[in-house]
UniProtKB/Swiss-Prot annotation:
Organism expressing this protein natively: Arabidopsis thaliana (Mouse-ear cress)
GO cellular component terms, A-Z: extracellular region
Superkingdom classification of source: Eukaryota
Gene Ontology biological-process annotations: defense response to fungus; killing of cells of another organism
Signal peptide: 1-27
Principal location: secreted
Protein name: Putative defensin-like protein 203
Subcellular location: Secreted
Cystine bridges: 30-79, 40-64, 49-73, 53-75
Keywords: Antimicrobial, Disulfide bond, Fungicide, Plant defense, Secreted, Signal
Family according to the record: Belongs to the DEFL family.
Length: 79
């Protein structure tokens, strides 16, 4: 009976640790820089922005964002 309680407690601890760590790993992204100018104003600019950032580093992604009334391609990746 004691062995069953220990095994059950160990299983619960593993589930707790795994479920607690996953959202943090996915949510942590940091600004890595800007891609080529004028990318976001073109047709399918957001796709091109994403491709340019991924070409720099495969773990990065790109997003077109407005900054100082201009649209820029910003690259983000893991911190």
């Amino acid at each position: 009976m004691a062995k069953l309680i220990v095994n059950f407690s160990a299983l619960l601890m593993i589930i707790l640790l795994v479920s607690n760590g996953l959202p943090k790993a996915v949510a942590q992204t940091c600004f890595k820089g800007e891609a080529q100018e004028g990318v976001c104003v073109k047709v399918d600019g957001s796709k091109l922005c994403d491709l340019l950032c991924r070409a720099t580093n495969t773990t990065w992604f790109g997003a077109c964002e407005v900054e100082d009334n201009e649209t820029h391609c910003h690259c983000y990746g893991p911190c």
